[in-house]
Amino acid sequence: MIIKNALVYTPDHTFVPGDLAIRDGRIAADTTPQPGEEVIDAGGLYALPGLLDIHFHGAVGHDFCDGTEEAIQALADFEASKGILAICPATMTYSEEILNGVMDAAAAHKNGRGADLVGINMEGPFISPHKLGAQNPAYLHLPDVAMFRRLQKRSGGLIKLVDIAPEEECAFDFIAQCKDEVRISIAHTCTSYDTAIAAFDLGASHMTHLYNAMPGITHREPGPIIAALERKAEVELITDGVHIHPAMVRFTFRTFGDDRVILIADSMMACGLPDGEYSLGGQAVTVKGPRATLTEQPGVIAGSATCLYDCMKRAVLDMGVALESAVRAASENPARSIGVDADYGSLAVGRYGNVILADKALEIQSVIQKGVRIV
């Protein structure tokens, strides 16, 4: 396949008028059309790399923690239709027994149709009881190396991220023992600046949904956010227009840099569906517009109802983030953060030929997966 006359997002994070070639499913250097080769005239559309969401829970009525092939395939199909061509869905805080079923289903899944399943983000249960967000307190568990390793074995090595509250008992031991086995993210935490610094120095390298479910910044208690800034951690941002004020989104891109920000959806099963009553982690959720909240605690946000592509689009059109930065934060950065950037996250030669063609309003005109047009 040849894509002609596009504004191509290059590995240098700039847009350049040009052509793309996809052969044997991967980006090729020679853009000269071969006899009989499919040629698409992009007519000046943006050519963006396929996105990668490393933190979302569900969509279109399904949740990753359903622990079924039906759910995984439904999520893969929906995400791909939105230009998200690789996924690393997140678990919720559940018992090991329930998580076993999720890991078994993920391990059995075969990539083919829809977004590629490239990892699992284990968001619970090693978190603080005081910063639960929409996590279920009934299933909280202290950080447990043996439990993690059992789950990782069942998943076939798919767990790429484990979330942890570093102030909890056993957390430092977990970080020290597991830092070379999985990426460790600080999340759902009451941690102080000093404890967060110590956790990063031990081997944590990531921060889950920055600003949400953690202490804020003050001049006497700088907290984990400043620790993440100083220790060069990668940080997730939910740019759905509900979780974070646009000024804070711009602030984060300026201070952390667009090489360290990772856009995520953190979406739940209502994403792609009308307003109504849903569930997340065994708790009732009410969705109205882009806002999802616990039904019994309307002040508690319960994930988002927005997919990653629309979060990226909103960051650009509504929040003042440069398109080049937002694309990087939704493609290259998440791919690198979970170690799959040799195949995903950019339009460099040798990467999978995953391309989104979008107009100047960032409306998707076509989605191409490994050289096959799927939208």
Regions found by a protein language model. Name each.
Residues 1-48:
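Histidine-rich, glycine-flanked metal-binding segment
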Residues 6, 336, 346-375:
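C-terminal cap of metal-dependent C-N hydrolases
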Residues 44, 122, 178, 207, ...:
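Conserved, mostly hydrophobic/aromatic
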Residues 46, 54, 64-116, 138-154, ...:
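Alpha-helical scaffold segments that flank or form the walls of functional sites
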Residues 57, 73-102, 115-128, 155-167, ...:
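Divalent metal-dependent hydrolysis catalytic cores, especially in the metallo-beta-lactamase
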Residues 77-88, 128-156, 200-210, 221-234, ...:
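Active-site gating loops and adjacent loop-to-helix segments of metal-dependent hydrolytic enzymes
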Residues 152-274:
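Active-site core of metal-dependent hydrolases
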Residues 224-236, 253-265, 271-351, 355-357:
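His/Asp/Glu-enriched, well-ordered alpha-helical/loop segment
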